[in-house]
Amino acid sequence: MAVAVGRPSNEELRNLSLSGHVGFDSLPDQLVNKSTSQGFCFNILCVGETGIGKSTLMDTLFNTKFESDPATHNEPGVRLKARSYELQESNVRLKLTIVDTVGFGDQINKDDSYKPIVEYIDAQFEAYLQEELKIKRSLFNYHDTRIHACLYFIAPTGHSLKSLDLVTMKKLDSKVNIIPIIAKADTIAKNELHKFKSKIMSELVSNGVQIYQFPTDEETVAEINATMSVHLPFAVVGSTEEVKIGNKMAKARQYPWGVVQVENENHCDFVKLREMLIRVNMEDLREQTHTRHYELYRRCKLEEMGFKDTDPDSKPFSLQETYEAKRNEFLGELQKKEEEMRQMFVMRVKEKEAELKEAEKELHEKFDLLKRTHQEEKKKVEDKKKELEEEVNNFQKKKAAAQLLQSQAQQSGAQQTKKDKDKKNASFT
């Protein structure tokens, strides 16, 4: 049974003044020191067609050269490739993960191109949820792979968004912070670029696509975020090559007709993107991922598992009540399954017994048949043996008679010879 515990309301809180220094004013410093020692993680998902400049822009944003293998247009499907890096600036360590959508937009049938991306984002949420639900959690050492920002690279067509872009962003907007950017903006004339930006934003609004809104509720960033929001989507140019401009070297793209400077705000919005993504709103992107997108996923998953905050009468549920209800439901299902399995087992045993009896009957019939056959064969052999024995006896009798006749004939011949001899001898005398 749940026990109701009273909680103080805001009206019950009293403001008190301190008579001396206590020391909790150092909490912000403690938090900064702890965060600095732990380091930070930031995960970026780059969604865009092959060859649109995703890797180059990442190299330019973080002022380094990341390892990246050039992708081909022959991928059978979309696959996501994640790579993690350890970066350090001053005394701040950042574990950066860049996830690339290899093969996106290269297939003839693009209907399911968004699915691997959604599945990857959900898989990272699920991994974090499973870690969070463990009895012995280790979130301090856990490598958080949830996507904090999705840079959606829009092809610089100058006309409108492709249906693939609209469908993909619509599928992703409830799962990740989408920041749309126009890639290779130096391929569009400036007047066309302004029209293209307006067209993109109107299409996003008309199709109900929710992109990341830069926070304006904090005084420290409200003004800059409000100013930068009107420039969405950012038209960017990426380059790691440095070109000499005047007396300085600057990152730029050299063309026969001139030079496009990456960090010149009159040429592109790269600086605005870097300010918004890294220097101003990186922590807000991390916070929005946890408090909005992950919480939505977590709530849906727990509701699927049967956990909820209120009963059908909108009365609050305690965790213990939810656990007991779920446990009883599980035990009921378990007993039902056990009974079904028992009945199935009994039925299978009966079927097996019937099969064994039938097999035993067949074996007995075969045995009886073999036994009769054996007896018949035995009788035939015995009869044949008797016939042979009779033939042997008859043969022996005939043989004995023949031998007797032969001996008698020999004796009679011998006697006759003797008589003739005696008669001859008598005549000489």
UniProtKB/Swiss-Prot annotation:
<dbReference type="GO" id="GO:0031105">
    <property type="term" value="C:septin complex"/>
</dbReference>
<dbReference type="InterPro" id="IPR027417">
    <property type="entry name" value="P-loop_NTPase"/>
</dbReference>
<keyword id="KW-0160">Chromosomal rearrangement</keyword>
<dbReference type="InterPro" id="IPR030379">
    <property type="entry name" value="G_SEPTIN_dom"/>
</dbReference>
<keyword id="KW-0175">Coiled coil</keyword>
<feature type="binding site">
    <location>
        <position position="103"/>
    </location>
    <ligand>
        <name>GTP</name>
    </ligand>
</feature>
<feature type="region of interest" description="G1 motif">
    <location>
        <begin position="48"/>
        <end position="55"/>
    </location>
</feature>
<feature type="binding site">
    <location>
        <begin position="48"/>
        <end position="55"/>
    </location>
    <ligand>
        <name>GTP</name>
    </ligand>
</feature>
<protein>
    <recommendedName>
        <fullName>Septin-11</fullName>
    </recommendedName>
</protein>
<keyword id="KW-0007">Acetylation</keyword>
<keyword id="KW-0206">Cytoskeleton</keyword>
<dbReference type="GO" id="GO:0015630">
    <property type="term" value="C:microtubule cytoskeleton"/>
</dbReference>
<feature type="region of interest" description="Disordered">
    <location>
        <begin position="398"/>
        <end position="429"/>
    </location>
</feature>
<dbReference type="Pfam" id="PF00735">
    <property type="entry name" value="Septin"/>
</dbReference>
<dbReference type="GO" id="GO:0043197">
    <property type="term" value="C:dendritic spine"/>
</dbReference>
<dbReference type="GO" id="GO:0008104">
    <property type="term" value="P:protein localization"/>
</dbReference>
<feature type="domain" description="Septin-type G">
    <location>
        <begin position="38"/>
        <end position="304"/>
    </location>
</feature>
<feature type="modified residue" description="N-acetylalanine">
    <location>
        <position position="2"/>
    </location>
</feature>
<dbReference type="GO" id="GO:0003924">
    <property type="term" value="F:GTPase activity"/>
</dbReference>
<keyword id="KW-0597">Phosphoprotein</keyword>
<feature type="binding site">
    <location>
        <begin position="184"/>
        <end position="192"/>
    </location>
    <ligand>
        <name>GTP</name>
    </ligand>
</feature>
<dbReference type="GO" id="GO:0032153">
    <property type="term" value="C:cell division site"/>
</dbReference>
<keyword id="KW-0131">Cell cycle</keyword>
<dbReference type="GO" id="GO:0030424">
    <property type="term" value="C:axon"/>
</dbReference>
<feature type="compositionally biased region" description="Basic and acidic residues">
    <location>
        <begin position="417"/>
        <end position="429"/>
    </location>
</feature>
<keyword id="KW-0342">GTP-binding</keyword>
<feature type="region of interest" description="G3 motif">
    <location>
        <begin position="100"/>
        <end position="103"/>
    </location>
</feature>
<feature type="binding site">
    <location>
        <position position="253"/>
    </location>
    <ligand>
        <name>GTP</name>
    </ligand>
</feature>
<keyword id="KW-0966">Cell projection</keyword>
<dbReference type="GO" id="GO:0005940">
    <property type="term" value="C:septin ring"/>
</dbReference>
<keyword id="KW-0132">Cell division</keyword>
<feature type="modified residue" description="Phosphoserine">
    <location>
        <position position="9"/>
    </location>
</feature>
<comment type="subunit">
    <text>Septins polymerize into heterooligomeric protein complexes that form filaments, and can associate with cellular membranes, actin filaments and microtubules. Forms homooligomers. GTPase activity is required for filament formation. Interacts with SEPTIN7, SEPTIN9 and SEPTIN12.</text>
</comment>
<dbReference type="GO" id="GO:0060090">
    <property type="term" value="F:molecular adaptor activity"/>
</dbReference>
<keyword id="KW-0547">Nucleotide-binding</keyword>
<feature type="region of interest" description="G4 motif">
    <location>
        <begin position="183"/>
        <end position="186"/>
    </location>
</feature>
<dbReference type="GO" id="GO:0001725">
    <property type="term" value="C:stress fiber"/>
</dbReference>
<dbReference type="GO" id="GO:0005525">
    <property type="term" value="F:GTP binding"/>
</dbReference>
<feature type="binding site">
    <location>
        <position position="238"/>
    </location>
    <ligand>
        <name>GTP</name>
    </ligand>
</feature>
<dbReference type="InterPro" id="IPR016491">
    <property type="entry name" value="Septin"/>
</dbReference>
<keyword id="KW-0963">Cytoplasm</keyword>
<keyword id="KW-0770">Synapse</keyword>
